[in-house]
């Protein structure tokens, strides 16, 4: 007696995960790297271009009253939060998932950025920044740089401190500051040469480059 073989169908899997993440399967473009890519990375897309930094830099250079770094930093804070929520986080892939925005982590990342102003300020002073004479302005520069790095800080915390990929964003901001220092000693006696105005602009330009092109590197 011959026995009939049952047709082998596709196995069905049921997931009981309570993770609020969105799976990449069927939700992301097929041209994403599947092999050899880091466990956490940012997709190559125009979505990560920080258009708000272009507008803010133009306002700071052309229309701000006396190059007000304090006001520029306060304007930057909500812009960076919206940029993270609407542009950077949706383009960031954690393993095989895009995680929804973690509101508690937004606050934690903000506090982390404030705490990072202290080592950032010490680093700026070690590179030759005025310390006692313009301590408030040096701290404002450090705060501005840390706010610029806010999306990268959030992503590092959200990926269990996988700093390897996101360090490029911090480096681009630091390099922008470093290059812009060349404008200060020039004998032009212009208002925009005062500390720390050139470095604020340089940090913004470095952040523009980083958030636009670091996903390609």
Swiss-Prot record:
A GO molecular-function annotation: mannose-ethanolamine phosphotransferase activity
Source organism superkingdom: Eukaryota
A GO CC term attached to the entry: endoplasmic reticulum membrane
Keyword list, A-Z: Endoplasmic reticulum, GPI-anchor biosynthesis, Membrane, Transmembrane, Transmembrane helix
Membrane among keywords: yes
Any Gene Ontology biological process: GPI anchor biosynthetic process
Chain ranges passing through the membrane: 45-61, 74-94, 111-131, 138-158, 169-189, 195-215
Protein localization: Endoplasmic reticulum membrane
UniProt key word Iron-sulfur: no
Membrane topology reported for the UniProt record: Multi-pass membrane protein
Pathway: Glycolipid biosynthesis; glycosylphosphatidylinositol-anchor biosynthesis
Family recorded in the similarity comment: Belongs to the PIGF family.
Role description: Acts in the GPI biosynthetic pathway between GlcNAc-PI synthesis and GPI transfer to protein.
UniProt-recorded name of the protein: Glycosylphosphatidylinositol anchor biosynthesis protein 11
Organism encoding this protein: Eremothecium gossypii (strain ATCC 10895 / CBS 109.51 / FGSC 9923 / NRRL Y-1056)
Phylogenetic lineage: Eukaryota, Fungi, Dikarya, Ascomycota, Saccharomycotina
